């Protein structure tokens, strides 16, 4: 089974992610790509994606990336064993996201034994713009 399929199974019970419509596209070693198709439930009063929507997309993508090394073991054991969780995040909003599909790509900047720093870049492929950059410190629990 591919890592993305394992990740989808492991994170299937993440109810808020399910409500928002975030999809796992690909998973590599400590990397992940997730997408979100914007619709009216994601919009703020100005018609752009609410900042919390972008944050949720980035936070989830970081969780998938940080736990990617456990996905095969999780699948074999049959129960989730997610050991990396968000400790701190910093989001930089760069441009409004108004339409289409948002793509989040998360990669590690520094990987330690107990903490790790990940960067997630959210892009709007429709207009080719980066809409947010998020740095997330993960902690091993």
Model-derived features: where do they sit?
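Terminal targeting signals and extreme-terminal segments of soluble enzymes
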Residues: 1-141
